[in-house]
Amino acid sequence: MLTRKQYLLLSFIDQRLKLSGVSPSFDEMKDALGLKSKSGIHRLIKGLEERGFLKRLPHRARALEVLRLPCNLTFDGDGEALDDGQPAPLFGGPLPETGFSPQVIRGNFTPTLPSTQVPQVLFTESISLPLLGKIAAGTPIAALIDPTSSIDVPASMVRGGEHFALRIEGDSMIEAGILSGDLAVVRRCDEAENGTVIVALVDNEEATLKRLRRKGASIALEPANRAFKTQIYGPDRVRIQGRLVGLIRSY
């Protein structure tokens, strides 16, 4: 049985590990949950360890391993989570052993998710982001345009920095859990580490969503679909516009 804060912390740690391969710092965890001190994070991690959801790796700084994620999760009136104890994934799909797995919010987002949706967590805050149009997860399409509308997303997705949203079009990233029609939440940046899923602007004309790989002086934009080929460009042909931090999926 998990408390709401334990569940949210476990979700945050799992998301960060899948995005970057590195556990968040205690300060980052404290800020993400809105706590005033790191002692509260220590207590939450201890509780997750005792319940078999989390493991601290010895002799390594900031080393946490998510052992399992709860399924069929609901909260009772006291904020306790009722879990059937099975090692199932948090967001309803298979838990990958490696590779990128973005945070996915299912359903059309509103500040409070209906109880019939998964995960059944109440998001009390939202933030409005500019929706810049469509981006290809396939063959690059037209470059990013000025915002024509906006969309509300959970505030926990956009901690720090400038963010925007794009509608995914194409299926070249499906093996990373990124589907055509998903709404991508992107943090604006012009640098990214190898393996990061980025928004890339090619030849100042076409935008695409791919995994970044640096190969010597060249830049490779790598799909997550065996039917597509990796595209390699000179460093002066590709500009990083941002990195993917989350997805919103409608059904």
From Swiss-Prot:
<dbReference type="InterPro" id="IPR006199">
    <property type="entry name" value="LexA_DNA-bd_dom"/>
</dbReference>
<comment type="similarity">
    <text>Belongs to the peptidase S24 family.</text>
</comment>
<dbReference type="GO" id="GO:0009432">
    <property type="term" value="P:SOS response"/>
</dbReference>
<keyword id="KW-0805">Transcription regulation</keyword>
<keyword id="KW-0238">DNA-binding</keyword>
<feature type="active site" description="For autocatalytic cleavage activity">
    <location>
        <position position="172"/>
    </location>
</feature>
<dbReference type="InterPro" id="IPR006197">
    <property type="entry name" value="Peptidase_S24_LexA"/>
</dbReference>
<dbReference type="InterPro" id="IPR036286">
    <property type="entry name" value="LexA/Signal_pep-like_sf"/>
</dbReference>
<keyword id="KW-0234">DNA repair</keyword>
<dbReference type="InterPro" id="IPR036388">
    <property type="entry name" value="WH-like_DNA-bd_sf"/>
</dbReference>
<comment type="function">
    <text>Represses a number of genes involved in the response to DNA damage (SOS response), including recA and lexA. In the presence of single-stranded DNA, RecA interacts with LexA causing an autocatalytic cleavage which disrupts the DNA-binding part of LexA, leading to derepression of the SOS regulon and eventually DNA repair.</text>
</comment>
<dbReference type="InterPro" id="IPR036390">
    <property type="entry name" value="WH_DNA-bd_sf"/>
</dbReference>
<keyword id="KW-0678">Repressor</keyword>
<dbReference type="InterPro" id="IPR015927">
    <property type="entry name" value="Peptidase_S24_S26A/B/C"/>
</dbReference>
<dbReference type="InterPro" id="IPR006200">
    <property type="entry name" value="LexA"/>
</dbReference>
<protein>
    <recommendedName>
        <fullName>LexA repressor</fullName>
        <ecNumber>3.4.21.88</ecNumber>
    </recommendedName>
</protein>
<dbReference type="GO" id="GO:0004252">
    <property type="term" value="F:serine-type endopeptidase activity"/>
</dbReference>
<dbReference type="GO" id="GO:0003677">
    <property type="term" value="F:DNA binding"/>
</dbReference>
<dbReference type="InterPro" id="IPR039418">
    <property type="entry name" value="LexA-like"/>
</dbReference>
<dbReference type="Pfam" id="PF01726">
    <property type="entry name" value="LexA_DNA_bind"/>
</dbReference>
<feature type="DNA-binding region" description="H-T-H motif">
    <location>
        <begin position="26"/>
        <end position="46"/>
    </location>
</feature>
<feature type="site" description="Cleavage; by autolysis">
    <location>
        <begin position="137"/>
        <end position="138"/>
    </location>
</feature>
<keyword id="KW-0378">Hydrolase</keyword>
<keyword id="KW-0804">Transcription</keyword>
<keyword id="KW-0227">DNA damage</keyword>
<keyword id="KW-0068">Autocatalytic cleavage</keyword>
<dbReference type="GO" id="GO:0006281">
    <property type="term" value="P:DNA repair"/>
</dbReference>
<dbReference type="Pfam" id="PF00717">
    <property type="entry name" value="Peptidase_S24"/>
</dbReference>
<keyword id="KW-0235">DNA replication</keyword>
<comment type="subunit">
    <text>Homodimer.</text>
</comment>
<dbReference type="GO" id="GO:0045892">
    <property type="term" value="P:negative regulation of DNA-templated transcription"/>
</dbReference>
<dbReference type="InterPro" id="IPR050077">
    <property type="entry name" value="LexA_repressor"/>
</dbReference>
<keyword id="KW-0742">SOS response</keyword>
<feature type="active site" description="For autocatalytic cleavage activity">
    <location>
        <position position="210"/>
    </location>
</feature>
<dbReference type="GO" id="GO:0006260">
    <property type="term" value="P:DNA replication"/>
</dbReference>
<dbReference type="GO" id="GO:0006508">
    <property type="term" value="P:proteolysis"/>
</dbReference>
